[in-house]
């Protein structure tokens, strides 16, 4: 009896392929976090804050400028009014220079005009110490005279009394360091000292005085002595 042979079909599932196929499937993408633009550190909020700050600064600057302009305009008006009030007490000379935009060069009454300055020799009763003389000039908007040229020296001496001495705006600050009251640099080449002067370290104020043999020149004396003086101020242009 022939034996029966039974055939069975056996199929094997390829697990590796299945696993491989599973592994190659794309993973689900992660969701990116959305930034909240309303948070304090966001660029838009910083930009807004910066613009507000710049606006406030601009407003502040504008207000300050308006206030400054108003005060400056007021000062000009007051200065103009003061000149108008003083005009009746001024002695004026018409300018002949076409380069000057102002027509008149003026000095207060009793003052003398020379160059760009006005000069005043106070009255006989006005003798005072050097400090007091400077104070008297200052109250008139002037200072003790500062001499810067031979021409100026000659003009000043031409209006002085040869029998008196006059304080000028030169004083010794210490160790023979001479200084002008208006801070003009002191230059040895533009000085008019008498021979042998200055002569004493204790005499710290300068006068202009006439000597019979040598004429007008400068002399140092004690600041506390009472002398006449010469005041100087810038001319007024109208």
UniProtKB/Swiss-Prot annotation:
Record-annotated disulphide pairs? 107-118, 137-231, 205-223
* Residues that coordinate or bind alpha-D-mannopyranose: 197-199, 203
Q: Which UniProt keywords apply?
A: Adaptive immunity, Calcium, Cell membrane, Disulfide bond, Glycoprotein, Immunity, Innate immunity, Lectin, Membrane, Metal-binding, Signal-anchor, Transmembrane, Transmembrane helix
Q: Which residues form the C-type lectin domain?
A: 126-233
Q: Which InterPro entries match?
A: C-type_lectin-like (IPR001304), C-type_lectin-like/link_sf (IPR016186), C-type_lectin_CS (IPR018378), C-type_Lectin_Receptor_IMM (IPR051379), CD209-like_CTLD (IPR033989), CTDL_fold (IPR016187)
Q: Which residues lie on this side of the membrane: Extracellular?
A: 70-238
Q: Which ranges does the record mark as transmembrane?
A: 49-69
Topological category with respect to the lipid bilayer:
Single-pass type II membrane protein
Its BP terms in the Gene Ontology are:
adaptive immune response; antigen processing and presentation of exogenous peptide antigen via MHC class I; CD8-positive, alpha-beta T cell activation; innate immune response; negative regulation of cytokine production; negative regulation of tumor necrosis factor production; plasmacytoid dendritic cell antigen processing and presentation
Give Gene Ontology CC terms: membrane; plasma membrane
GO terms assigned for molecular function: calcium ion binding; carbohydrate binding; D-mannose binding
Q: Organism's domain of life?
A: Eukaryota
User: Which intervals of this chain are the motif ITIM motif?
Assistant: 5-10
Fetch the Pfam families from UniProt: Lectin_C
User: Subcellular location, in the record's words?
Assistant: Cell membrane
Q: In which tissues is it expressed?
A: Expressed in splenic antigen-presenting cells including B-cells, monocytes/macrophages, and dendritic cells (at protein level). Expressed in spleen and lymph node and slightly increased with dendritic cell maturation.
Residues involved in N-acetyl-D-glucosamine binding: 209-211
Q: Which residues are glycosylated?
A: 91, 131, 136
* Ligand binding (Ca(2+) 1): 146, 152
- Assembly notes: May interact with PTPN6 via its ITIM site.
State what this protein does. Answer: May be involved in regulating immune reactivity. May play a role in modulating dendritic cells (DC) differentiation and/or maturation. May be involved in the inhibition of B-cell-receptor-mediated calcium mobilization and protein tyrosine phosphorylation.
**Domain notes for this protein:** Contains 1 copy of a cytoplasmic motif that is referred to as the immunoreceptor tyrosine-based inhibitor motif (ITIM). This motif is involved in modulation of cellular responses. The phosphorylated ITIM motif can bind the SH2 domain of several SH2-containing phosphatases.
PANTHER family, alphabetized = C-TYPE LECTIN DOMAIN-CONTAINING PROTEIN-RELATED, KILLER CELL LECTIN-LIKE RECEPTOR SUBFAMILY F MEMBER 2
Q: What is the name of the protein in this document? A: C-type lectin domain family 4 member A
**What is the organism field in this record?**
Mus musculus (Mouse)
Q: What is the lineage of its organism?
A: Eukaryota, Metazoa, Chordata, Craniata, Vertebrata
Query: Which gene carries the instructions for this protein?
Result: Clec4a
């Amino acid at each position: 009896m022939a034996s029966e042979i039974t055939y069975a079909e056996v199929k094997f599932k390829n697990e590796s392929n299945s696993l491989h196929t599973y592994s190659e499937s794309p993973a689900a993408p992660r969701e990116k976090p959305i930034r909240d633009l309303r948070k304090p550190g966001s660029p838009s909020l910083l930009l807004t804050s910066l613009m507000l700050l710049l606006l406030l600064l601009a407003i502040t600057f504008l207000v300050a400028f308006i206030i400054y302009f108003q005060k400056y305009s007021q000062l000009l008006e007051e200065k103009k009014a003061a000149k108008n009030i003083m005009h009746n007490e001024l002695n004026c000379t018409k300018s002949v220079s076409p380069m000057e935009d102002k027509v008149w060069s003026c000095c207060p009454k009793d003052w003398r005009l020379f160059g760009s300055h006005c000069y005043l020799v106070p009255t006989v009763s006005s003798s005072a110490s050097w400090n007091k003389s400077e104070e008297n000039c200052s109250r008139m908007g002037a200072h003790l005279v500062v001499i810067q040229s031979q021409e100026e020296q000659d003009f000043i001496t031409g209006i002085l009394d040869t029998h008196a001495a006059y304080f000028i705006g030169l004083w010794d600050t210490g160790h023979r360091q001479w200084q002008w009251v208006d801070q003009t640099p002191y230059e040895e080449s533009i000085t008019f000292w008498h021979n042998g002067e200055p002569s004493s370290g204790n005499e710290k104020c300068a006068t202009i005085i006439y000597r019979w043999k040598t004429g007008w020149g400068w002399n140092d004396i004690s600041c506390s002595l009472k002398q006449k003086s010469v005041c100087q101020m810038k001319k007024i242009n109208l």
